[in-house]
Amino acid sequence: MSGIGWQTLSLSLGLVLSILNKVAPQACPAQCSCSGSTVDCHGLALRSVPRNIPRNTERLDLNGNNITRITKIDFAGLRHLRVLQLMENRISTIERGAFQDLKELERLRLNRNNLQLFPELLFLGTAKLYRLDLSENQIQAIPRKAFRGAVDIKNLQLDYNQISCIEDGAFRALRDLEVLTLNNNNITRLSVASFNHMPKLRTFRLHSNNLYCDCHLAWLSDWLRQRPRVGLYTQCMGPSHLRGHNVAEVQKREFVCSGHQSFMAPSCSVLHCPAACTCSNNIVDCRGKGLTEIPTNLPETITEIRLEQNSIRVIPPGAFSPYKKLRRLDLSNNQISELAPDAFQGLRSLNSLVLYGNKITELPKSLFEGLFSLQLLLLNANKINCLRVDAFQDLHNLNLLSLYDNKLQTVAKGTFSALRAIQTMHLAQNPFICDCHLKWLADYLHTNPIETSGARCTSPRRLANKRIGQIKSKKFRCSGTEDYRSKLSGDCFADLACPEKCRCEGTTVDCSNQRLNKIPDHIPQYTAELRLNNNEFTVLEATGIFKKLPQLRKINFSNNKITDIEEGAFEGASGVNEILLTSNRLENVQHKMFKGLESLKTLMLRSNRISCVGNDSFIGLGSVRLLSLYDNQITTVAPGAFDSLHSLSTLNLLANPFNCNCHLAWLGEWLRRKRIVTGNPRCQKPYFLKEIPIQDVAIQDFTCDDGNDDNSCSPLSRCPSECTCLDTVVRCSNKGLKVLPKGIPKDVTELYLDGNQFTLVPKELSNYKHLTLIDLSNNRISTLSNQSFSNMTQLLTLILSYNRLRCIPPRTFDGLKSLRLLSLHGNDISVVPEGAFNDLSALSHLAIGANPLYCDCNMQWLSDWVKSEYKEPGIARCAGPGEMADKLLLTTPSKKFTCQGPVDITIQAKCNPCLSNPCKNDGTCNNDPVDFYRCTCPYGFKGQDCDVPIHACISNPCKHGGTCHLKEGENAGFWCTCADGFEGENCEVNIDDCEDNDCENNSTCVDGINNYTCLCPPEYTGELCEEKLDFCAQDLNPCQHDSKCILTPKGFKCDCTPGYIGEHCDIDFDDCQDNKCKNGAHCTDAVNGYTCVCPEGYSGLFCEFSPPMVLPRTSPCDNFDCQNGAQCIIRINEPICQCLPGYLGEKCEKLVSVNFVNKESYLQIPSAKVRPQTNITLQIATDEDSGILLYKGDKDHIAVELYRGRVRASYDTGSHPASAIYSVETINDGNFHIVELLTLDSSLSLSVDGGSPKVITNLSKQSTLNFDSPLYVGGMPGKNNVASLRQAPGQNGTSFHGCIRNLYINSELQDFRKMPMQTGILPGCEPCHKKVCAHGMCQPSSQSGFTCECEEGWMGPLCDQRTNDPCLGNKCVHGTCLPINAFSYSCKCLEGHGGVLCDEEEDLFNPCQMIKCKHGKCRLSGVGQPYCECNSGFTGDSCDREISCRGERIRDYYQKQQGYAACQTTKKVSRLECRGGCAGGQCCGPLRSKRRKYSFECTDGSSFVDEVEKVVKCGCARCAS
């Protein structure tokens, strides 16, 4: 009977438990989010599949993680799973049977992983799988049983892999397959047996492979022709004559095999031994092979793996679980820092595990679970800092354990209790703290003397360096905070160390007086009192820090600058019973500030700026006993303000300016009744109640008469005078603001600051926590910072369009996780750094158009990002580089975003303006948030770029070492003292010293600097060519190749040996000059003969025997007629016309783009092209604000024109005014825009860049438009009957100035070449595409050049300089003329001068007073620096050194006295002057001189010729007596 009862009870319990299991909800894995039957774990950086996935899960998202391995247990039990997303991980291994429980699986995505192979029969249990994506992996082969069991697959994607082998029958079971992608692989051959069982196949991609089109692939051509819609673009890659041919177009006879070839069915078996390793006798040896990960798919029978001395960093889950017979595993001397908890799972035979010499810091829980046979465990030379108490619980047979040389400070009691067979243990070289928690280890080692390495204590100091096994146990004791920090070490929990800048004593953490502005991140959990007083806190943020401090009881925030406490700031502080907020800057108190303080008993709010206590200020603080509001600015307390404080026993309201009007009437009676208030709070207003205790005022005296109706608790908000406020919306638009106005309500949700003068995002915006919209458009903001939008967690809309933004810092938008709309339209942004939008997870719309985006590889991420969910509407276009110009960010393929060489410096300088070196003349550049950059100029220069000299000599105008001197009495003038050998206004002329030279024997004089050189004839030498040479002397004989040298009157001649010619017999005579080589043979010269090198096919001594005749090939361009000046070039053996700018077509026969450079030009299209129902589309680019694009009609007309940069379309049917529509977009940015015009009988539609069309409908009367009139493009003729358009309001009637291309009328591309071409209309769109001429007309001068024809009153290359310069003929004496306007100027005086015209001298310090010149005199340089000008024969800074004797060439007049007349040579004469000193008592003087005749002119008008002695050589000689 009892047995039956127990059975019944067991059955009942089982039934109840079964029901509970089905009803009770299962927990969601940590970090993941669960909704219904969907589990979302994407993008969490997971390294393995999380455990505890609910059994009822139908959809599991694991994409975007770091998972490397899929094991058999990862998805065990998930029998309801239908969708599994595993793309974008690092999966390299999938164990066989990993999907065996997924009976309901329908869709599986494994694309973008690292799979190289996958086991056969992997999908055996997934009978309902119909979509499988394995693309973008590294799969090399498809084995025969790869998809066995997955018979319902309809969509199979294998593209972008490395597949080179597909075994026969691999797809045989996939009879329902509809989509198969094999493109972009390495496939060379295929068997027909692989594809002849797919009757439903509708999409098949095989292009971009290495197909070898020989006889074995002939079946594929017929197969593709029978299915013309599949296998498109499949091409042969070999043999060479078929390369690039479509397989379906190759005839069957062309599929030939050379020689004897037999086709073997491919076998895709993969070697189990890795290529880098050796395998023998069940041992896999991979030592020192540079491996970075554990090799996979090893033989399952191996018993030993040697992986030491590699670079492995991670041991993934189940890395060795397939190898059940493994006995020895060596992983020493790697870089292992991460071990999966189940890394060694299932290795029951393992008896040796070597892990020394790695970077392991912690042993995961259950790491050694189940290793019952382990005898040797080496963990030495790692960085292990803790051991869990159960780390070795299954190691009953362990003999040796080495933990030598790690970072262990303590070991929990019981850690080694399971090691029943332990014989040797190494614990030395660990920094053990020998406190009370390590006492057990000393006792253990006394009882079991197995520690042989000599483990010692590191601290405390009294036990330092003593052996643990030799210390008495009573000396192991705890003091201070040691007990708190290490008492949980058995769970690998050691509490945090004392924070930097703080002091810890017992359970008190003191961080006061440290100028902190936020709470330290790492506070020990044992903290009971936290002191943060006397710091720089302004806002207490909700960081969740108090959730980590379960023991906290008291917090001190006194003497800070706190103005606000965020909601949730104290969340988790449920145990805190005392908070001190004394001496801060709080202005109001709200209950949400103290949310989470359920146990608070004391709240100190003394000495703040609180003006009102509301009736909801202290809701939720029912435990507070003491509340101090002493010394605030409280004037009003709302009725019921203290009703929620049920435990309140002490209330301090003293030292507050209470206004005892009708709003405070309730408080007097409340104070009398409660009797919990400290002292007697007194009235301060009205005057007749001043200093009267509130509780003593009669109820009838609390009145609001005489205008005393102030109530600080009134909900009315303030509004700045510059703004308008409605509820929580504040509008401050178009007010010229440069700073944020004061008085904006704290609860503002929408703030409009557009149309102002802000240059930076106001820092004060971070104080407004409730903002959901900020509009800062149309300001002058040039820079953003990483903190521009901090603390704006609720922001939904941020508008920054039409500013001067050039650069987006990487973390500008961090924290804006709620943002939905971001507008950066109309700025100067070229690059957005990758990761800048990482936190914008809720963003649905990004406006970034009208920016010069530089779309290289660094912007590929942004293109992918906007494409992912169409977050950008297709407006943003690229400005470069190269072919990316004008491409849409949204639709351009990602592969087009490539980097070709270094990025242009102008692009890089947008985020670092100083990179472009804008500061001239060695100025120092500093980045500036408003002006982009600022230059600190060196002495002598000024201006924004330091490019303006302060006076004329600063720029060193005197060349070749000349000295600059400022002129007196002239504006900015200077004069130069030239160095010897130079003359001219700027010392730019090198004097011709050869004009009077002494070169002899017909030698040639070569001018130098203040000297000359004589270039001698071959037979002479010497300084003046005065010595004759013997050329046939042994050391000078120039004759080569044993030829004979013979002296001649003019020099020498060489008598050459046979076979050589030339002046020096140095040329081997070319015997090929008169050769008999035939048929284009190459003649090779030899000594006294030659050899004929025959072309291919020719033979004979002179190549006279010809080969069989072959027909010469002709160039493909010979009969290919390129038009309009185009050049024919050959690409891939095909002729192609390279068109000139503006032309298009196979032979460049059409002109499709023209440039309107003359504002009186237009094109005329015949009327037959335009009917009542017409669609006109064209692309335009211009910088102009106005101009006519299209015009048709007479009095009644259709006109499309530019009006203030927008497109205006008007339809005048005779009514006044004409009907008109305008585009939303402005298009005068220089970029191309698409304009589309659609006319119907009663409507006109205008669309720009594919945007929403603007329409004119329901016209006032039937149109009388003359459709027989022509259509004018780019302008119109100046006839009287179109004057109405020119005079219409807002219209200027001027012709278009810019570029028009791709004009379509009713889908027909128009050829401008067929229209009359006026002057001022040029083919193509460059170089006058941009508005380069400021006040004039651009005229192209070549394909890439241009000239500007200036308007009246302007001049310069770009017509940007006015012709009337007021500084012409100015009267500034010692200064610079500065124009004030077109008619007047002012003088900026040089240093030392003053007055209106800088004509008055001022006292000036003479720098020459500080310098002494021994043999010379002091001069001032052009920049005002003193220097010594030395006398002849002396040098040095002070002219104190005598130079050695040398001849200094001077150029001067010779002078003579003839009676009373002074005479001099008619020109300057060059001569030597001997200067310097000599040693040994000798004198410097002439060694050689000449006499030369010169003409002289005298002061009395006479002239004569006389000889003059000239010195030609100087040196040291005996002094003259």
UniProtKB/Swiss-Prot annotation:
Residues 1445-1520 form the CTCK domain. The keyword Ligase does not apply. Glycans are attached at residues 66, 186, 556, 615, 786, 791, 1001-1002, 1011, 1175, 1258, 1292. Keywords: Chemotaxis, Developmental protein, Differentiation, Disulfide bond, EGF-like domain, Glycoprotein, Heparin-binding, Leucine-rich repeat, Neurogenesis, Repeat, Secreted, Signal. One of its GO terms (cellular component) is collagen-containing extracellular matrix. One of its GO terms (molecular function) is calcium ion binding. Residues 26-55, 264-300, 489-525, 710-746 form the LRRNT domain. It holds the Pfam family EGF. One of its GO terms (biological process) is negative regulation of axon extension. Disulfide bonds join 277-286, 434-457, 436-478, 498-504, 502-511, 660-683, 662-704, 719-725, 723-732, 855-878, 857-899, 914-925, 919-935, 937-946, 953-964, 958-976, 978-987, 994-1005, 999-1014, 1016-1025, 1032-1045, 1039-1054, 1056-1065, 1072-1083, 1077-1092, 1094-1103, 1117-1128, 1122-1137, 1139-1148, 1299-1325, 1333-1338, 1350-1359, 1367-1377, 1372-1387, 1389-1398, 1408-1418, 1413-1428, 1430-1439, 1445-1484, 1463-1498, 1474-1514, 1478-1516. Expressed in developing eye, in the optic stalk, and in the ventral diencephalon. Residues 209-259, 430-480, 656-706, 851-901 form the LRRCT domain. Disruption phenotype: Mice show significant axon guidance errors in a variety of pathways, including corticofugal, callosal and thalamocortical tracts. Mice double-deficient in SLIT1 and SLIT2 show retinal axon guidance defects and a disorganized lateral olfactory tract (LOT). Residues 1-25 form the signal peptide. LRR repeats lie at residues 56-77, 80-101, 104-125, 128-149, 152-173, 176-197, 301-322, 325-346, 349-370, 373-394, 397-418, 526-547, 551-572, 575-596, 599-620, 623-644, 747-769, 770-791, 794-815, 818-839. The leucine-rich repeat domain is sufficient for guiding both axon projection and neuronal migration, in vitro. Homodimer. Interacts with GREM1. Binds ROBO1 and ROBO2 with high affinity. PANTHER family: SLIT HOMOLOG (PTHR45836), SLIT HOMOLOG 2 PROTEIN (PTHR45836:SF2). Thought to act as molecular guidance cue in cellular migration, and function appears to be mediated by interaction with roundabout homolog receptors. During neural development involved in axonal navigation at the ventral midline of the neural tube and projection of axons to different regions. SLIT1 and SLIT2 seem to be essential for midline guidance in the forebrain by acting as repulsive signal preventing inappropriate midline crossing by axons projecting from the olfactory bulb. This is Slit homolog 2 protein. It comes from Mus musculus (Mouse).
